């Protein structure tokens, strides 16, 4: 995702060392299909859209509860480089207080596919996400400062394990590492810390099991299901917030078709700072590059 001559030189060097990222279809590394996970980011660039994602968050320590409904769009600029944009409409209910609604801040991002290694079912990308200042409603807590978040996303399938471990080969692991850098150290009387974000997803692909390991006779809709558990944690590390890690664990399942997928997960807080009780999220997600390969799903440039 570099924006100058260095990007061209870096991409050329990677192309000489690694298998071509552009040669693979949406979310594939060899025989491995990586679905678009709900909580953590995908390790591949693509033209795709989540329309919508609906999230009922666990109850917070002050008794408030938030419902988020939001679209998210990703478009390929080149076969290895994309741009993302999204936001959430938020509905927050607090005990003894009026309900507040409004849009959260605008989020954009850009990602560059570092490599896709088909024989080892591995891929990774580097990106930069931005949460923009003054682009949402203050009533729902949209920030008045911009946050820059460089990120690394990766995925690894276990299909290259030996044949003596057949039932482990459908497993895959994806993950994210990122840092948040707010452009203001303080706003509205509150300090804004830097934050280390880390998350991963453990997946077990029924399509991979039946197509690449052993057909166990599952028919529709189970033959396209991918059970998974996602984990995401955020750890501030300065400005008085050290030791206040929050996060969620989200077990669920994704049904992945040729042109779209449907996913649902429970939301379980990791500690009292993250809330209490159980939440949930559902998502309808479209593969635009497969739906419209000669239209809006096509990269703007083939460079």
Go through the PLM ranges and name each one.
Residues 3-4, 15-16, 32, 229:
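Short non-domain terminal segments
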Residues 14-17, 269:
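Short coil/turn motifs at helix boundaries and re-entrant loops, enriched in small/polar
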Residues 16-24:
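C-terminal segment of classical bacterial N-terminal signal peptides
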Residues 25-303:
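Transmembrane beta-barrel domains of Gram-negative outer membranes and organellar outer membranes
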Residues 1-10:
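Bacterial N-terminal signal peptides that target proteins for export
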Residues 9-11, 33-34:
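Short N-terminal leader segment in a subset of presequences, especially plant chloroplast
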